[in-house]
Structure formats: structure tokens, C-alpha cells
């Protein structure tokens, strides 16, 4: 009974936190006078990846950076396969070419680079530093571009939020999302354990979704409120943060031993999911892509559990 209450509490907390966090993103874009997608790709993406960053850093300091690697790469599959797949079921997403520029193609290149580093069965500190350096260069590039594109403030539905209120809403909203993720993982794990479900299954299926709950709520609410560019930017930015910063930090603290078969599967699924996200010339990502993404995610989970 307690576990069910935890899950219900997680749902309520996630809804409230997600609404506050989305308003904070829109408020930040308004006050900084930059496009919403830039704020989503940077601030929102980094904030929603906080659970993965915390977990991977703690694991690396404990001498188990493989946990951080699995969480980061697995979360990337969850982000696109599960989360955007669900978002597309609500309807097609209209994007622009600007939404799929350098950030998207870098997100495609990162899994290939990670695979090359992993071929010898480990990601060495030097290779992790390379990933982290690429992340910092990309971040500087995005910030520089944002400063160049600053213009007059435009009403984007953020209301009359002051910068201070936007910041407070962002902190409270993100805190609620992270807490909701922890409640969800705790409740679901308790139920699964009571039913005799294997611990690995719990980790692969439930914990991955729990740590990605901030992205899930942000993207779904962005869709419902008509801010699709926020959802797209958050997921692409989160994938870059996971693949470059989190793996880079974990590997810099401690070299990562790589189970090549599992990592190859995860990287391949993440890459295929990104390719399915690429829109046509009209910029439209059609609804049936969502079905394909969900099938891909389900296949990834099933194969992972059987391996």
C-alpha cells in the first residue's frame, strides 16, 4: 500500500514540478531574449540530467563508473525512444531546420565516437577527457551563438514572471521532478521486489525511467502547451549532456571497463532513435515515427533483459 502511495505521490509531484519548470524555461528565454530552443538545449537539458550526473559521479567516486556509463547511455535511449515516442502519439511535431542543426548532428556523432573508444574494452581517462572537452567546446559555441541571436523580448506565454520568480520556479520545479523520480523508483522497486521480479529487471526498466522522469514531464507538458521546440531542445541537449559530460566526468574520475556487447546495443539503439527523429523537408515529424520509436525502445528492453 505504501509503495502505491509513493507512485501516486510521484505522479502528483511530477505534474506540479513540470508545470513550474516549464514556466521557468519560458521565463528564462523571455528575460535572456534568446530562442526557447537554446534555453531548452542548455539550461533545461542540463537541469533535467541532474539525477544522472549525481548518480554517475557518486558511482565513479566509489570505483564503479560502469554504473554511470550504463545510466547515461541507457537514458539516451529512454529520452528519444520512450519519451519522444510517447510525445508523438499526441500528434505530429512541427519543427524547423534550426532545431536540427549542429546540435543534432553532434548528437549523432557522439555514439560513434564512444563506440570507437570502447572497442578495446575500456574508456581510458584520456578518452573521457576528450569527451568532456568536446562538451565544453560545444557549450561555449552555443552560448556564443545565443548572445549573437539576442533580440527584443517576445511574449511566449511565460506570463509576468520576473527573473527572480523564474529562478525560484525553476529550482522548485526541478526539485519536485527529481523528488518525484526518487519516489517513483522507490515505489516501483518495492512492488517489483514483492512480486519477485529480478533486481536487474528493476534497474533496467524502472530506475532508467525514474531518472528520466524530469525529461518525460518537461517534454509532455511542452507538447500540451504548444512549445514543441522546448521538448525537442531538451531531449537533444540532454543526450549531449549524458553522452559527453556525464560519461566524460565518470571516466575522468575512474577508467571505465566496457561490456562491449551491451554498450554496442545501447549505442546502436540510441543512434537509430535519433535517425527516426530526423524530420522531412517540411520539418514535420509524423505520428507513426512515435510508434516506431516505442517499438525500438521495447525491443531494446527485451534484448537487454535476455542478454
Residue positions per predicted region:
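Hydrophobic alpha-helical segments, chiefly the membrane-spanning helices
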Residues: 1-307
Amino acid at each position: 500500500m505504501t509503495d502505491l502511495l509513493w507512485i501516486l505521490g510521484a505522479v502528483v509531484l511530477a505534474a506540479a514540478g513540470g508545470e513550474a519548470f516549464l514556466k521557468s524555461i519560458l521565463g528564462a528565454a523571455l528575460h535572456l531574449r534568446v530562442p526557447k530552443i537554446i534555453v531548452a538545449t542548455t539550461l533545461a537539458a542540463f537541469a533535467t540530467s541532474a539525477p544522472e550526473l549525481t548518480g554517475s559521479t557518486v558511482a565513479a567516486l566509489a570505483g564503479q563508473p560502469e554504473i554511470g556509463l550504463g545510466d547515461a547511455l541507457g537514458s539516451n535511449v529512454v529520452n528519444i525512444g520512450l519519451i519522444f515516442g510517447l510525445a508523438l502519439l499526441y500528434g505530429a511535431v512541427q519543427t524547423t531546420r534550426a532545431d536540427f542543426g549542429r546540435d543534432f548532428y553532434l548528437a549523432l556523432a557522439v555514439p560513434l565516437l564512444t563506440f570507437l573508444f570502447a572497442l578495446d574494452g575500456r574508456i581510458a581517462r584520456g578518452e573521457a577527457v576528450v569527451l568532456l572537452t568536446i562538451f565544453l567546446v560545444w557549450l561555449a559555441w552555443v552560448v556564443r551563438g545565443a548572445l549573437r541571436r539576442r533580440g527584443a523580448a517576445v511574449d511566449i506565454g511565460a506570463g509576468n514572471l520576473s527573473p527572480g520568480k523564474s529562478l525560484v520556479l525553476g529550482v522548485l520545479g526541478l526539485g519536485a521532478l527529481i523528488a518525484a523520480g526518487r519516489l517513483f523508483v522507490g515505489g516501483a522497486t518495492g512492488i517489483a521486489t514483492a512480486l519477485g521480479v529480478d533486481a536487474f529487471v528493476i534497474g533496467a526498466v524502472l530506475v532508467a525511467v525514474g531518472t528520466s522522469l524530469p525529461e518525460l514531464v518537461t517534454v509532455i507538458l511542452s507538447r500540451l502547451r504548444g512549445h514543441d521546440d522546448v521538448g525537442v531542445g531538451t531531449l537533444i541537449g540532454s543526450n549531449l549532456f549524458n553522452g559527453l559530460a556525464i560519461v566524460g566526468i565518470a571516466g575522468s574520475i575512474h577508467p571505465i571497463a566496457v561490456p562491449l556487447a551491451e554498450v554496442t546495443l545501447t549505442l546502436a539503439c540510441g543512434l537509430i532513435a535519433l535517425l527516426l527523429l530526423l524530420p522531412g523537408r517540411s520539418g514535420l515529424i509524423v505520428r507513426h515515427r512515435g510508434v516506431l520509436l516505442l517499438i525500438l525502445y521495447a525491443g531494446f528492453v527485451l534484448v537487454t533483459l535476455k542478454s
